[in-house]
Structures are given as structure tokens and as C-alpha cells.
């Protein structure tokens, strides 16, 4: 039974988000790490993300059974009662928000709240099922964790936080479209209006290319503005150019599914590489006026 409660939180998604939280936190910490704050931020974000994933599993249980990838999820198979799932998700969320508020700062908590509301309230409940722009809206919630990690340290939403938001939001788009392409039949069967299904794979390829170009600019800005060092800059340039090259090869591919799967896999390599590099190659001299400083 414990295993089912763990699976419904989508551990893989939690782990992926924690990598970005670490990147944002250590970028802001600049080598001076407050370990209790670091641990509290990781646990707090984990709880909030877990809560969002459980709510998402509850909301999507009707369409999950139509998709090959999700037909064996816990709620689809009835291994946990829906009513219990709601209580579980609520407890996880409250615990996460309270921990971020007490151990980090109110700004970190409110960023988590905004990411949660966008993911559960806007994306999962409505946009995912009714709009081709659902992925775009959902990308904002996916970009929240590194910003929370960053602001847990700075207690200010400055240019660095804004660039992180841009990097991770832009990354989500080609990453998600790639999934929709190699899982095309799943999304089509479930009636989910993702871009490749609604507009076609050719249009999705154009969007993927443009988003990767924008992603490249955003990643380089983190170093050019002075938040990260030249080693980060080199890695950011290499992974962005390589990812762009993979996207361009999609115009000549004979198998869209295989190409999209490779693009998806490399997207994980790319964002992980950037998270690691911003963690270890930060710039101690960067300073930027806060766009929003939360004083409590």
C-alpha cells in the first residue's frame, strides 16, 4: 500500500524538479550554503510537487485509462480511493507550503502557491483538455521549482529569477511537444488538444525549433548578465546548439516518433547539464536590482 501512495506522487517528476531546485538554490547561494534552508527548500518543494501530481492523477483518471502510457496508474486501477487521494494531496500541499513559509520565506511559498494553482487549477482542470495552449500555460508551473530555490536564498525576485523562469518555461515546450509526437496516438485517443495533434507534426516542428532558439538565448543570458561563469556559458552554448541541430534534423527524418523520442531524451540531458553547471559555476560578482523584494 505504501508503494501505491508513493507512485501516485510521480517520483520521477519530483526528482527532476529537485535537480532544478538545487540549480536555482546554489546559483543564488554563490558558494555560501545554508544547509538547513537548503534541506527545507528541497523538502518543501517536493511536498508541493507531490501534491500537485496527486491532484493531477485524480483529475486525469478518466483520460489516463485511454492512454497506453498511463492506463496502469494507481487511480486508474482503483488501488487508492479517490476520496482518500484528495485528502492525501491536500495534506502534502499544506505541509509543503507551511514548510516553505516557515523555513524559507513568504516569497518562496507564494511562488510555490502560484505554480501549484497554475498546474492544478488552470492547466489540469481546464487548459489541458480544452486548449492547444495548455502546454504553454503549464510550462509556467514547470518553471517554478528553480525560481523557488533561487528566491529561497535571495528573498527577492530579481533578473536572475526572471531568467531562470524564462529558461525553464521555454525548455518545457519542445520537451512536451516531443512527448506528444512520439505518444501521438495516446493523446489523440484521449482527446487531448496538444499542438501536434491539433495543428499537425509539421507545425509542431516549427514551434520546437523556435522555442529552442529562444531557450538558447535565455540560457546564454544567465552568463552574459553576470549570474553564471564562462564554463556554464560554454556548456549552455554547446547543449543548446546540439539540441537545435537535433530539432532541425526533424525536417528530414523518415520516422517522426524515433526523432521525437531522441529529442525528448536530449532535452533531459540539456536541462540537467545546465542545472549542474549553474550550481558549480556561479558568478560571485553578480548583483541586480530586485524586481520584487518580499519584506515580512
UniProtKB/Swiss-Prot annotation:
Assigned keywords, A-Z: Cell inner membrane, Cell membrane, Heme biosynthesis, Membrane, Transferase, Transmembrane, Transmembrane helix
A Pfam family that the UniProt record links to this protein: UbiA
Catalytic activity: heme b + (2E,6E)-farnesyl diphosphate + H2O = Fe(II)-heme o + diphosphate
InterPro entries from the UniProt entry: Protohaem_IX_farnesylTrfase, UbiA_prenyltransferase, UbiA_prenylTrfase_CS, UbiA_sf
Highest taxon, organism lineage: Bacteria
Annotated pathway: Porphyrin-containing compound metabolism; heme O biosynthesis; heme O from protoheme: step 1/1
Protein name (Swiss-Prot/TrEMBL): Protoheme IX farnesyltransferase
GO (cellular component) term, any one: plasma membrane
Membrane-traversing stretches: 13-33, 35-55, 84-104, 107-127, 132-152, 162-182, 208-228, 229-249, 264-284
Membrane topology: Multi-pass membrane protein
Single GO MF descriptor: protoheme IX farnesyltransferase activity
Class in the EC hierarchy, top level: transferase
Record-listed E.C. numbers: 2.5.1.141
Sequence similarity: Belongs to the UbiA prenyltransferase family. Protoheme IX farnesyltransferase subfamily.
Note: Carbon 2 of the heme B porphyrin ring is defined according to the Fischer nomenclature.
Amino acid at each position: 500500500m505504501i508503494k501505491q501512495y508513493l507512485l501516485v506522487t510521480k517520483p520521477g517528476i519530483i526528482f527532476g524538479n529537485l535537480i532544478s531546485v538545487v540549480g536555482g538554490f546554489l546559483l543564488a547561494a554563490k558558494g555560501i550554503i545554508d544547509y538547513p534552508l537548503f534541506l527545507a527548500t528541497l523538502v518543501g518543494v517536493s511536498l508541493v510537487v507531490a501534491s500537485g501530481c496527486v491532484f493531477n492523477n485524480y483529475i486525469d483518471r478518466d483520460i489516463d485509462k485511454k492512454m497506453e502510457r498511463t492506463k496502469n496508474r494507481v487511480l486508474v486501477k482503483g488501488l487508492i480511493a479517490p476520496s482518500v487521494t484528495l485528502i492525501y494531496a491536500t495534506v502534502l500541499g499544506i505541509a509543503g507550503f507551511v514548510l516553505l513559509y516557515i523555513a524559507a520565506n513568504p516569497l518562496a511559498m507564494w511562488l510555490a502557491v502560484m505554480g501549484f494553482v497554475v498546474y492544478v487549477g488552470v492547466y489540469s482542470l481546464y487548459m489541458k483538455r480544452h486548449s492547444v495552449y495548455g502546454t504553454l500555460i503549464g510550462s509556467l508551473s514547470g518553471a517554478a521549482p528553480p525560481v523557488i530555490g533561487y528566491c529561497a536564498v535571495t528573498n527577492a525576485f530579481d533578473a536572475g529569477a526572471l531568467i531562470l523562469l524564462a529558461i525553464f518555461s521555454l525548455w518545457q515546450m519542445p520537451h512536451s511537444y516531443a512527448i506528444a509526437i512520439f505518444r501521438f496516438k495516446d493523446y489523440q485517443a484521449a482527446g487531448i488538444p496538444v499542438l501536434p495533434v491539433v495543428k499537425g507534426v509539421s507545425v509542431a516542428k516549427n514551434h520546437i525549433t523556435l522555442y529552442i532558439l529562444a531557450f538558447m538565448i535565455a540560457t546564454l543570458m544567465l552568463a552574459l548578465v553576470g549570474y553564471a561563469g564562462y564554463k556554464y556559458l560554454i556548456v549552455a552554448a554547446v547543449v543548446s546548439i546540439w539540441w537545435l541541430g537535433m530539432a532541425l534534423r526533424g525536417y528530414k527524418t523518415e520516422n517522426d516518433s524515433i526523432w521525437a523520442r531522441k529529442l525528448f531524451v536530449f532535452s533531459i540531458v540539456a536541462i540537467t547539464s545546465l542545472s549542474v553547471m549553474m550550481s558549480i559555476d556561479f558568478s560571485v560578482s553578480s548583483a541586480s536590482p530586485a524586481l520584487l523584494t518580499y519584506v515580512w
